[in-house]
Amino acid sequence: MAAPRTLLLCPPSLSAHPEALNKIYEIHDRSTADLQMLDRIAAGLVQLPAATYDVVLLLTDADGTTRESHKLLARDVASKVAGALKVGGILKAKTEAILAGLSESPNGMVKTEQVESVSIPLKFGKKKTNGVNGTNGAVNPDGSVPLNLNGKRNQPEPVKPVGVGFVDFSDDLDDPIITGEDDDDDLIDEDDLITEEDMARPVIQQCRPKAGKRRRACKDCTCGLKEKMEAEDAAKRTTADKALNTMKLGADDLDELDFTVQGKVGSCGNCALGDAFRCDGCPYIGLPAFKPGEEVRLLNNDIQL
């Protein structure tokens, strides 16, 4: 009997630790064990042979955890590993193994034999009558059992309330046996309900504006997007006109302001701050600083405050 073959799935971090790999080969004989890197299998650089290995062992990372191994053991890699297992083979790792078609066992994840599914038709027959030989459990006063030879029921019909209708669910109404194989004679083909006129009718596509761009209405827009955009443009235009009207200046607004009036300042706003803040053409150059609103008179080049 051939020795069981083992596939060792190694994370890339172990390749930088040869001492760890040597310990692994001390436990597993190289003649019966194959070592493959998980990243090479995930990249498609290594093709695993089909139905070859009895045991697949997922090795831990260099730090003793399985984070890197579980990250690389994705569903497609797990499917490749499951294909390399023999029937009854064991994969000692749970990540994505069940989704790859493996079953859990006390020793690990086992590859079970695939059995083709068989469809079984269900047949529904008539409801069986109670009792034996169609007697419905009825017994005569003398202890004898009446036999129903004509196959019909002898029970009297229940009295129906006046003005009230009900359905007797115990009556099978002598319907034929349902075999589950429906007759297609009563089915209507949906394509027969569509006429040539329906096929030629154009289908109006829904307006679906692209993200990041301004919506544009179709030329023959019927969904109301065109009217909505026109209303938005009109509202923006009205807002802009109102803002423009507030910025217009009249003739009175352009006149020079008299600094002698309380609360008013000159056009430059610095007439009352002294020469250091006055313009070149200011008529008050050389005059001392004065308070806004203070009356200033010039008489024979003398300052009269």
UniProtKB/Swiss-Prot annotation:
HAMAP family: Anamorsin
Primary location group: cytoplasm
Pfam families assigned: CIAPIN1 (PF05093), DRE2_N (PF16803)
GO biological process: cellular response to oxidative stress; iron-sulfur cluster assembly; negative regulation of hydrogen peroxide-mediated programmed cell death; negative regulation of nitric oxide biosynthetic process
InterPro entries: Anamorsin, CIAPIN1, Dre2_N
Motif (Cx2C motif 1): 268-271
Family statement: Belongs to the anamorsin family.
Region annotated Fe-S binding site B, chain positions: 268-282
Name of the molecule in the record: Fe-S cluster assembly protein DRE2
Signal peptide annotation: none
Keyword annotations from UniProtKB, A to Z: 2Fe-2S, 4Fe-4S, Cytoplasm, Iron, Iron-sulfur, Metal-binding, Mitochondrion
GO molecular function per UniProt: 2 iron, 2 sulfur cluster binding; 4 iron, 4 sulfur cluster binding; electron transfer activity; metal ion binding
Superkingdom of the source species: Eukaryota
Disulfide bonds, paired cysteine numbers: none
Ligand binding ([4Fe-4S] cluster): 268, 271, 279, 282
Linker, as annotated region: 121-199
Keyword check for DNA-binding: no
Subcellular compartments: Cytoplasm; Mitochondrion intermembrane space
Gene this chain is encoded by: DRE2
Organism: Phaeosphaeria nodorum (strain SN15 / ATCC MYA-4574 / FGSC 10173)
Names of the cofactor(s): [2Fe-2S] cluster; [4Fe-4S] cluster
Residues the entry annotates as binding [2Fe-2S] cluster: 207, 218, 221, 223
Keyword Cytoplasm tagged: yes
Domain notes: The C-terminal domain binds 2 Fe-S clusters but is otherwise mostly in an intrinsically disordered conformation.
Biological role: Component of the cytosolic iron-sulfur (Fe-S) protein assembly (CIA) machinery required for the maturation of extramitochondrial Fe-S proteins. Part of an electron transfer chain functioning in an early step of cytosolic Fe-S biogenesis, facilitating the de novo assembly of a [4Fe-4S] cluster on the scaffold complex CFD1-NBP35. Electrons are transferred to DRE2 from NADPH via the FAD- and FMN-containing protein TAH18.
Motif mapping: Cx2C motif 2: 279-282
One of the record's GO cellular component terms: cytosolic [4Fe-4S] assembly targeting complex
